[in-house]
Design a protein with these regions (language model features):
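Conserved residues at the C-terminal ends of beta-strands
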Residues: 1, 116, 147-149
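Catalytic-core regions built around general acid/base machinery
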Residues: 167-184
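Alpha-helical segments flanking ligand/cofactor-binding loops in enzyme cores
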Residues: 27, 134, 175-178
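Short, flexible loop segments at the rims of nucleotide/cofactor-binding pockets, characterized by
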Residues: 16-20, 121-123, 163-166
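Short, acidic/polar
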Residues: 125-133
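Short acidic, glycine-rich surface-loop motifs adjacent to enzyme active sites
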Residues: 134-165
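Protease zymogen maturation seam
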Residues: 1-39, 52-56, 156-158, 170-171
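Subtilisin-like serine protease catalytic core
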Residues: 27-125, 139-142, 155, 181-184
Length: 185
């Protein structure tokens, strides 16, 4: 049955992404033409190591669909020399290697923002995240994808969040995320 699905699908997902796509019936969306086109997705993470040279992003790069990048940690436009986690998250959305790996929205446009300093946990990263969300909003993002969360800051333990703090109203990143959601992001 699986091979019949692959033959009928718009994308040849290969063995590496079919189960992940199928988990949410994503191939149905791809088959009816919903592949992320006209969507603007901001990814806030710890870096996008070498995304410009990896085969998985050939389509995104060739079509100029990375619309903006910014490193809020080092305050520069380049995000390619830092940690790979953001690139890995980016691949689950944007990758397109026929027969090997296809992301969930391989035709979307992207904003890649490094807000996480992977050298340690510092409270400034929450502020970086909010700045990234604000920039995403100003650039017209429809979606923010971020796997970051903040509770403990070993370098500054007095800034740790208590359980009571994590009510969605007290820490800057929760307030920023709430404001983005109220704007429809």
């Amino acid at each position: 049955a699986r091979n019949k699905n692959l033959e009928a699908d718009y994308y040849n997902y290969g063995n590496n992404s079919y189960n992940e796509i199928h988990l949410h019936n994503g191939e149905f969306l791809h088959n009816i033409g919903l592949r992320g086109q006209a969507m603007r997705i901001a990814i806030l993470d710890g870096g996008f190591f070498n995304y410009k040279t990896l085969k998985a992003f050939d389509s995104v790069n060739a079509e100029g669909r990375v619309l903006d990048t910014w490193d809020f940690v080092n305050r520069e436009a380049s995000v390619v020399e830092d940690h790979p986690h953001g690139m890995q998250c980016f691949s689950t959305i944007a990758a397109n290697i026929p027969g090997q790996f296809t992301g969930k929205a391989p035709k979307a446009n992207f904003f890649l923002y490094r807000t996480e300093d992977t050298n340690g946990e510092n409270a400034i990263e929450e502020h970086n995240w909010v700045c990234g969300a604000e920039r995403a909003d100003s650039m017209g993002a429809n979606i923010i994808s971020s796997s970051l969360g903040y509770t403990d800051f070993p370098q500054s333990p007095t800034l740790n969040h208590t359980y009571a703090d994590m009510n969605g109203n007290n820490n800057i990143s929760a307030i920023g995320a709430d404001l983005a959601a109220k704007k429809g992001i």
